[in-house]
Design a protein with these regions (language model features):
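Cell wall/extracellular polymer interaction/catalysis modules
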Residues: 22-167, 171, 177-180, 197-200, ...
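Secreted, cysteine-rich disulfide-bonded mini-domains of extracellular proteins
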Residues: 264-304
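Short beta-strand-to-coil "C-cap" segments at the C-terminal boundary of structured domains/repeats
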Residues: 215-221, 299-304
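Fungal secretory targeting signals
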Residues: 1-22
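Short, solvent-exposed secondary-structure boundary/capping segments
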Residues: 179-192
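Intrinsically disordered, low-complexity regions enriched in glycine and serine
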Residues: 257-264
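Intrinsically disordered, low-complexity linker and terminal regions at domain boundaries
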Residues: 202-211
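Aromatic sugar-binding interfaces of carbohydrate-active proteins
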Residues: 190-196, 209
Length: 304
């Protein structure tokens, strides 16, 4: 029995080591540290979520850098970010069995029709292969807290950067949280979770520490589309690496990323011409927001 346990432990370590992680760029590392040192979000787009069932419900979607870097991220209070739960939804097919223990598997992901419409030989995302992140909360049950990232420019199947365990991976926004449980945030596909934390996570085991940074990028330029990613990839590494070029470009939006002709450390130019009335800023009526933005839930948002 002891030798068997050693075998499975070694297998988990080998699996984690064969996945090539990205180094965390200095500008992303600086952002990570500044978010945690700030303690809590100043421009919370929506709060009242759990990082895991039964915790403080002090977690939410943050828009502190929605106007300057065009990013949204998840954050708690007192320096906490969020945890990493494991999603096994979608077209699993054959895998390593790490999703077998999941008691909450849905047969399709939220954007299944779009994925199938890419005509790349797959019907849906596969949690064993595709690196995807769960964002947004949809439900109709009484008291369930909803949030739609689209209202803040985050588009379906757009690129998301995940900083976990002092490494970084790229994924896409591929699923949403439903009201079959409490309003939760902080979840990724099984393959992405295991790339981050190896065999310590599976369909029934999460990474519980609130130290994971999820960075979603607003705008249509963050969407790889049918031909910008290897949707018919046969492995996690093949799919994740196909997002590298676009992901690296998007990360340069963050102060210190350089590129685009700006000086390192300067935030990228925003499309908003009315400072203080941009995407994610506070408002009381539509006229308080720049351009075609509208006022929703007292925040300037895209009219979706």
């Amino acid at each position: 029995m002891e030798s068997a346990l050693r075998f499975f432990a070694l297998t988990g370590l080998l699996m984690a080591s064969t996945t090539t992680a990205r180094d965390v760029p200095q500008n992303v590392r600086d952002l990570y540290n500044s978010i945690r040192s700030q303690g809590s979000c100043k421009n919370q787009l929506k709060g009242g979520f759990y990082s895991q069932e039964g915790d403080s419900k002090n977690f939410g979607y943050c828009g502190d850098h929605l106007a300057d870097y065009k990013i949204m991220y998840l954050q708690g209070k007192n320096g906490e970010l969020v945890n990493m739960d494991i999603d096994c939804d979608g077209a699993l097919g054959e895998g390593d069995g790490s999703c077998d223990s999941s008691g909450d598997t849905q047969p399709q992901t939220t954007f299944q029709e779009t994925v199938a419409g890419y005509n790349k030989g797959i019907k849906d995302l596969n949690a064993y292969i595709h690196s995807f992140v769960v964002l947004g909360n949809d439900g109709s049950k009484n008291g369930y807290i909803e949030f739609k990232p689209e209202q803040y420019g985050i588009e379906p199947l757009s690129t998301v950067a995940v900083v976990c365990g002092d490494k970084m991976f790229y994924g896409v926004w591929g699923d949403t949280n439903g009201d079959d449980g409490p309003p939760l945030i902080g979840e990724v596909s099984d393959s992405l979770g295991r790339a981050c934390y190896g065999s310590a996570v599976n369909g029934n085991a999460a990474h519980d520490e609130n130290d994971v940074l999820y960075i979603a990028f607003a705008g249509s330029d963050a969407v790889p589309g049918a031909n910008g990613a290897k949707w018919n990839a046969k492995s996690f590494s093949e799919f994740e690496s196909s997002l590298g070029s676009l992901g690296d470009k998007l990360v340069q939006r963050i102060a210190g990323g350089g590129g685009g002709g700006g000086s390192p450390g300067d935030p990228p130019a925003s499309d908003c011409s009315w400072e203080g009335h941009c995407l994610g800023d506070k408002c009381s009526k539509d006229g308080d927001c720049d351009g075609e933005l509208v006022c929703k839930a007292k925040k300037c948002a895209v009219d979706a």
